[in-house]
Every structure is written in C-alpha cells, then in structure tokens.
Design a protein with these regions (language model features):
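Short amphipathic alpha-helical segments and helix-helix/interface helices
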Residues: 68-69, 91, 113, 167-168
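A residue-level signal for beta-strand positions that form part of recognition/binding surfaces
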Residues: 57, 98, 206-208
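A short, well-structured juxtamembrane/interface segment
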Residues: 52-77, 83-89
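Catalytic core of membrane glycerolipid acyltransferases/transacylases, capturing the structured
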Residues: 76-130, 134, 174, 190
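Non-catalytic C-terminal accessory region of glycerolipid acyltransferases
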Residues: 2-52, 72, 118, 133-269
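Short, flexible loop segments at the rims of nucleotide/cofactor-binding pockets, characterized by
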Residues: 55-60, 79, 126-130, 156-157
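Pocket-edge structural micro-motifs
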Residues: 62-64, 82, 103, 213, ...
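Structural signal for conserved beta-strand scaffold positions within catalytic alpha/beta enzyme cores
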Residues: 62, 101-103, 125, 180, ...
Length: 269
C-alpha cells in the first residue's frame, strides 16, 4: 500500500501528567553559559527552518501503512524505530502526532530536542550512554498516558545501523508493538563527516517510507529472548534498507532527470 499523504495517528489520548507535559516543553537552559544558550536557540531555529523548508518540497510515498494501522488497534500504541541517519526525513513525515522521542542529554541533544518539539514531538532526555534508564521510565509513563514513542534505534552515537535494546525494553514494559520503518529519498546529500552519514534530501525529490509488520515483545521475556528480539528487529530494518535502496535505484533509472544530474556530476561541456 502506498500514497503521498502522511499516515494518520490513531493512538488514544488519555491525560498528561508532569512527565508528559515536561516532554513537550523546552528544557531549562539556566545551567548553560550565555554563549551556549544563544547557540542552542540559534541552531535549533535554523534546524527547524531547514527541515520545514526541505520537507515542504518532498513528496512522501508510504508503503505498508496497514502495518502501522495494525499496531494502533485495540488500544495498542506504536513504538516507531528507524535509523539515526533518517532523522530529518522522519521528523517531517510524522510531524504533529505527539510522538515522544528519546534525545541525548548532551549539548547537541538540547537543540535537537527543541527542533523536534517545534514539529509536535515530545522529548525525554537520555540515551544509551547518559541517563537512559530515567528517560526510558519517562517514556513508559508517557505511553501509559496514550502517547506513541520513537527511537533512532542506533543512536545517539552508533555503531551505525546496529540496533540497541531501548525499544525492546520499552515494548516489554508496556506491551505495545515495535514498528520498524525505513526512509529513502530519491536524491540526497550525505553528511559523510557525521558518524551516521546523515541523509539530507534534495529539494523537490521524492521519499519512500516503508513500514514493516509490528514486532511484539512478551512481558516475561528473558535475556535470551531479548537477544532474539534484537536480531529480529535488526533483520527487519536491514530488509527495509535493502528495499529502500532498490526503490531508489529503480526510481532514478526511470527518472526524467538527465543522467549527469542523477549522478551528481557536472553538466557535460
């Protein structure tokens, strides 16, 4: 199933406690110097503007929306998982749906959190390296209040495209299903100096969003079971990545753009 419109969020809404309200508010910057506060506000504003500007020119096409709908039935709420390199594409594709995302407690995490909050996301602060348990507890609370969650599943610092256990543990504690998702633009830049080689779509390109069947995690799963679910999630995302790259190749081979533009080469002289 495919289409160009954004998928509708069907998760229930209950209420907001203090943790949930905090996730949707900008964090206090009083612990930072004036220079760092200015940097956070400036960079977050620029990042928001760039994503909004680029995103408004991208035509998104969704495949597998029935899997997202299945994960949202009978009181269930999806736990979105995708690779960190797709964060710009994901932010715009699923904007305005009150999804709560775990963001790093680092300086960089401050402006990323503010940028995504402007698109209607909540942000809990923590990662696999800093404050992860506390952030996971906050995500459990927000999901119990009816809010979906999302993980850049190889973040915040990699290794690139290697699944980490946060989403598995959240699914175990909440009973909600994990939904693997992959994104690919038809034309893009890659930030090769960043650890994840962040994907920046080129203006007026298309973007394919492929959604895999949900993965459920039993509440009594043991350590070996967690490892098995990690492999299942890894395999699902790897398969989605291959499908995305196949779509990109097929799309560009039939594109009306001249070959030298598709290759990123100079115009023939």
């Amino acid at each position: 199933m495919s289409g160009s419109s954004s998928p509708k969020d069907r998760s229930p809404r209950a209420h907001q406690d203090d943790a949930t309200r905090a996730a949707f508010r900008f964090s206090d910057l009083s612990g930072y110097s004036f220079k760092k506060r200015l940097t956070i506000r400036t960079v977050s504003g620029l990042l928001t503007g760039l994503i909004r500007l680029l995103g408004s020119t991208i035509r998104y096409e969704f495949e597998g929306r029935e899997h997202l709908e299945a994960a949202s039935r009978d009181g269930r709420i999806p736990i979105y998982t995708f690779w960190h390199d797709s964060i710009a594409l994901a932010t715009y594709a699923f904007r305005g749906q009150n999804i709560v995302v775990m963001t790093s407690q680092s300086f960089d995490g401050e402006y990323i959190a503010r940028a995504i909050q402007r698109f209607g996301y909540g942000a809990t602060r923590g990662s696999s390296t800093r404050g992860g348990i506390g952030a996971l507890i906050e995500m459990i609370r927000t999901m119990r209040n009816g809010y979906p969650a999302a993980f850049t599943i190889d973040g915040p610092k990699g290794p690139r495209h290697v699944v980490k256990p946060g989403a598995i543990l959240l699914a175990k504690k909440t009973g909600h299903p994990i939904v693997p998702i992959a994104f690919v633009p038809s034309r893009s830049w890659s930030l090769s100096r960043s650890w994840d080689r962040t994907i920046a779509p080129k203006p007026f390109s298309r973007a394919r969003v492929i959604i895999a069947p949900p993965i459920t995690v039993a509440p009594d799963i043991d350590e070996a079971g967690v490892e098995a679910k990690l492999r299942e999630l890894q395999d699902s995302l790897d398969s989605l990545e291959r499908r995305c790259q196949a779509w990109r190749t097929a799309h560009n081979n039939r594109s009306w753009w001249p070959a030298w533009i598709r290759r990123g080469a100079r115009a023939p002289g």
